[in-house]
Amino acid sequence: VTLQLVNARDAKLKYQNDLIESEKIARMVLVSDNGMSFIGPKISNTLADIMNTSPVSQSYFLESSKSLNNEVFRHKIQLIYSYNASKPRGFKAANLCDEWGRCETLIQLIGESSVSFSNCSNTNCNYTEVFEIDLSDKLLRDSIQKGLRMELISNKKTDKLNLSVAYLMGYFNVVQ
């Protein structure tokens, strides 16, 4: 019984924190003049490998548009990866992950990405890779209460991406 009370209290505190954070996110969502296009705030993270030798900068934001005639929403997540490597990663696919960390449901094969490079040495360059993933309205709205976790698969590595409950709540408070 004590564990259930502690878990209930923790869930309530997390929900209250998510509400506060979602209000901040909602204020940062950009809306077009005609109210048909939306851009969420950019979130940036630094991912490090076990030995922290080659940190990766991961940035993302949601972008949505509403059709004029039937009010259907189209959503995509824009992703920007910056890293130092011998070759570009070449992201190929994104899998949806469940709450237990299993990432077995293919969301989308990733098409073309934009890759730029700079500061090359004999062995490595600084790469910036930009790509997008289409996400269904149902998938995003179903994820508001638990967040959305994805696995991004490249030729070299697999990375995780987490869209928080607060981000999705704030974004969809505006995108209606």
Q: PLM features: residue spans?
A:
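A generic "folded-domain core" signal
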Residues: 1-145, 151-176
